[in-house]
Amino acid sequence: MEKIIKEKISSLLSQEEEVLSVEQLGGMTNQNYLVKTTNKQYIVKFFGKGTEKLINRQDEKYNLELLKDLGLDVKNYLFDIEAGIKVNEYIESAITLDATSIKTKFDKIAPILQTIHASGKELRGEFAPFEEIKKYESLIEEKIPYANYEAVREEVFSLEKRLADLGVYRKSCHIDLVPENFIESPQGRLYLIDWEYSSMNDPMWDLAALFLESEFTSQEEETFLSHYESDQTPVSHEKIAIYKILQDTIWSLWTVYKEEQGADFGYYGVNRYQRAVKGLASYGGSDEK
């Protein structure tokens, strides 16, 4: 692997620059490496096994270029779809946020989401949650291993009409707001990275993802929304509740597919599925029109 990495980033290096070390990092979707050279450090990502069926890399590459002027992401130096590799800027001594630290950064995160949602950018790709569920179902080869899946699925799909009644607004969205996709430089600049799933969707999807992935309390959600909500970025609590259910359903199926490809995520998938079931039980709609 080190040999492949050296070959791929050689075009980025000056004549006197050479690779000193290659260190593997974590990542649920891709294989990530920190590459140190005599002059610089890079993050090298190899697209994970089976991800070509999940992620449209042509769309991702286009979206990264389109969003570049917003200044939200780290620099991308190389995006080679055929080779399945991406080389990004490494932020020295950056702190990766987690489910605790993210809750101290509302004043920085809210403007980032406002910027993308109100940008008017027409991203490639439409993130259609119900189609995503069908996609993963078609990719999974074995019987879906979750209790009462067919009955739960029927209940999940009953939300489609309610969403349509509420109105789904097409805006540019990140889609995958896990806390680890926010990194902060020593100077205090916050970056939003990993735009693989970026596409057009309702901004409430992003808010639901932010809240779910970092397990916000109801009070923390309301506090964040007080930073985010504006005339350009309105809020729908009911859509957030629906999107939480859809996200847990989708990522529980994503886990089944990835584990069929050889990954092992322990109880991650079943925990998300069970949370979707709980979300359905507690969802009561609202008076939103």
Task: Describe each region flagged by the PLM.
Residues P234-K244:
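All-alpha amphipathic helical-bundle segments outside canonical DNA-binding/catalytic cores
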Residues K105-K108, N148-L159, F265-G279:
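Extended, well-ordered alpha-helical scaffold segments
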Residues T29-T37, I43-V44, E160-L207:
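Active-site acidic catalytic loop and adjacent metal/ATP-binding pocket
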Residues M204-Q232, I245-A263, R275:
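Active-site activation/catalytic loop segments of kinase-like enzymes and analogous catalytic loops
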Residues E23-Q24, T29-A128, Y146:
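ATP-binding pocket architecture of kinase catalytic cores
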